[in-house]
């Protein structure tokens, strides 16, 4: 294709062929296109036979930019072969060429008014005076020439000349003519472009290219669909359908796009790929796809060599409607038992998914009952409000009796004189109601000896299960001729007499004895009982286990054949004999004293927990539930949170208590007790739950329930108990996930917990069931009864529950008497101290503006709390750095909460208080003002002010809740935290709680582990799906690193949230909020008392030097120099392998920021603040400010760096403050600009590059935060420049963690070579090696400045701090790799007791490992220290 043909194709593509002159169309050439994929730019080089008319030129440029806007930023460079009338065209193009420069809109407007003369290749621009001439010549000469040349003009020079009267007169008519033609050209171009847009829009409507539904290729026949799991090899043509769970649309270098989607049909998953086709609207169809949509796809199955898996290369794809699960019942049920992702490592979906599904099915209400926690409540409330459904709040807890008796049926019998029958039963199962005794064995004990034995089998008249045979080693053959149980029990009762029964886990064995006695008409046994299991738990509290096997070993008793009754009995007897002696030593002498004298506060730990459902009935019930949850997590936590029955009874008001699942007390009673006892227990509850038979299938599989018939009988007994007690029986689903196919995720999570008892059995189907599904589950009860328990009773129970709101809807701040007055007085007092009694009006106006908002909105107390915390830290000798936007508040400055002064840059005289403010935006920071002396008294002036609007802190109306974040020294942080307890009281302050969920990487490990254990192979796409299913489930709890929640004195914590220990660590110093702190962020005050290295380092530098950091000059020239060159450190770039001197300087030491420094070479404080803002923002530097600076459009000081810059810049540009604030807020949140904002900015001549920059930004850093960080950084840098050893000692002590001492003690050349080698291998370095490299970079710099590192010194090294000796540093013991804090302390303590005599002595006294001793030896730290001490004759 010729270059002329290429030009025609281009003209056709951008649809302007009909608009161009025929000669130009036929003779124009597209000579080349320069493409930069990195910068997304295309530059078209076009040769034309003559100049385009100005309006055609504008049309061409607009059309080509529009056509390729989604692909790249397009520019054009024209060459005109016949430059006839160049001077005439230049005049017409003048305005357009000016627009291509980086001048401000205002200056561009001025320049366009100038007259010009074209003479050959020289363009003269007539200006008014020499000032204009110099300004224009410097500002735009080069860029204006470039703009003309890009348009095809052959121009060598542009000259700016001053006008004289003759020139003005001669050119007046020409100026008017040019202006008229410019306006006409612009109008014609605009009309043509609008016409083209309308035609294009019409064409799009006709072609339906803006698609809502994806449809590419041919329709796919449904009969060709095959399950994804059947795809196991490459195939030519396959059709599948599935739901999208991941999608990725990428643009290729060629300009085409590829869509990669992952779909599943729940048999397996597959990756599908497709490229956009030429001249098709595939991209629009790809964009119509999204996660959750069902598609039908057809294509070729092939092996993808990159992911090493089968993928489908699609030829056809269509979006389809998939039938969703419906609840078809006319009357809907209410679910009262379900678990969300907050049920730790057990539930799968978040509560929002359940609520949405229930609403879609038309359910009137839904409950949430997570295991032991209520952390889903805030999200449940939000979801219920969103979907218009009633939310029922509840929890499934662990109920325990307050004290589990050791002795039953107390007898007045002296223990040493008593006769005991130690016995054991073997049975066909665990239920004394449904299973039978097959062996009864006992020994009689008196005076510490076994005096008789009893051993009998009994015939159950049924075959034993394999489980029982394996457990007891009793076979059916052994029981064939055995007597009936009636005979055995009668004989046994007579043999026992009035002896005291003893058994291990006596409640089980006595349950079978009492049930047997009652069936024989004897009534329950009246003999005393002692349970050796509970006895051991009480008197052997140091044991972690109390099983018979374990106790036999501990007591030295032989147990030859566990789970055979006679052997278990004899072992228990010998253990019990020794226990009687233990009880005697504890003062327990009589059977009736055992429970009383051996009871303790920890009795709840011995009780076996039963599940219980607690439903909140009203607002009082919510608070009571919060109290119960808190007590169970804080006071009664033992392996799991426990709820003593007395605690539940105390706080039962407003709660409905349900029987929960098969682990509930009532279900267990049905298995172990007769009906009268079951009904007695049932009366404790407000409702009885029965769950689908499918959920109990594992009990049948594990032979805990005999069969389905027995299970149905259990249901009937539960229903009868409810009817008798007048308690509603409801069917609950015990849901752990939404749909059947989600169950695999729960299996994976359970399998990841080796100790979880659920691993012992097959997990039942626990999906969220529809009404018709539940009715079908209980069809065996009959239609009427099934409807009653599934629909009628659940709805009636839901109607008894009031609307409950778990989260407050307003902020409750603490009260401090006189806070308003104190903040006002403190602000003015410090302002007068700084600015004088006669305050400048700008100071008064700012204070009054802020105080009106702060006091008017009740925020004074927040300021006062922060002031007290900062003052305490300052009084204790630690500086505090502010974070966030608090430095935007002048009141915060005057109350000494922050050092950042947000007023415009200004001078202040420390003596006569004269001040001078710069309000025009000409100075970025007061610290950048030149040094100056007071004209009145001659004193050096103080320089202050960072020019930050107050609105960035409390919002434009000043009513946004202040978020005051403070950086305390890391070592002082615990003191600051504890000081809040002094201010408010221990029961009013809590750490802000967090919830840790399963991360994607962790979930991947779980999935891989599960598949490996099961011997299952799955392709990568299916693994990705399973990972997504497991991600986000609660794994643990934690605490915010510095967040303290303050409860006002007129409320208590339970008005907002329950409390707990982080990660259930009962030894934690602080309790946390049970809710994630974000949930209550708007209801209670959160103080961010964070720990930071900078204040700690400043404190150490102050201690070493005696220099008050507040006296350090911020504009020290040598300090400023290190941000662009290392010269002031006395080293070269080559020596330290870096072009700046900022290694180890906070905010400026990372490779990323050092590169920014190299690119920008900042010289002022305000520019350093810009760097800090640019480095912390998202899409603020890369692809944005960086390109603007590189291309010369603007410099570092004028790019957008911090969020506040936007508001200040726009106000200086003439925008109303309210609009400037709106724009700043929109941009900083990544929301871009609205049409109204863009229009307003253009009206005020804001340049296009500024608008473009705003549109790219995703997140911005507050200027106050950046200023506070830079202030700390500059102070630390001051020590680096002027007091090097103090700096290096502090840096290595405070900030460094990984050391290579072997390298660090070498000469500077060796250290440099090591650093250089690590740079060459950087991409292969692990995290630890990269941390070591950071330390070696600093060490290399230190060495080239003439200082060195000594080896560890046994005599001089400290535990944790680097110390200075001459021009060297001595490292501490903690710097030795692998040596921990305790060992470091121990070495110093041992050294204080006397010198180490040998390496063996060092090992014994300090506990050093051989590996560390060898390291110290290699380091040269153990000179002349022998391996073993030599005994001298003089020591004898």
From Swiss-Prot:
Keywords: Cytoplasm, DNA replication, DNA-directed DNA polymerase, Exonuclease, Hydrolase, Nuclease, Nucleotidyltransferase, Transferase. One of its GO terms (cellular component) is cytoplasm. GO terms for biological process: DNA-templated DNA replication. GO terms for molecular function: 3'-5' exonuclease activity; DNA binding; DNA-directed DNA polymerase activity. Its main location: cytoplasm. Residues 420-576 form the Exonuclease domain. InterPro entries: DNA_pol3_alpha_NTPase_dom, DNA_pol3_finger, DNA_PolC-like_N_II, DNA_PolC-type_N_I, DnaE2/DnaE/PolC, DNAPol_HHH, DnaQ, Exonuclease_RNaseT/DNA_pol3. It is found in: Cytoplasm. It catalyses: DNA(n) + a 2'-deoxyribonucleoside 5'-triphosphate = DNA(n+1) + diphosphate. Its EC number is 2.7.7.7. NCBIfam families: dnaq, polC_Gram_pos, PRK00448.1. Required for replicative DNA synthesis. This DNA polymerase also exhibits 3' to 5' exonuclease activity. Belongs to the DNA polymerase type-C family. PolC subfamily. This is DNA polymerase III PolC-type.
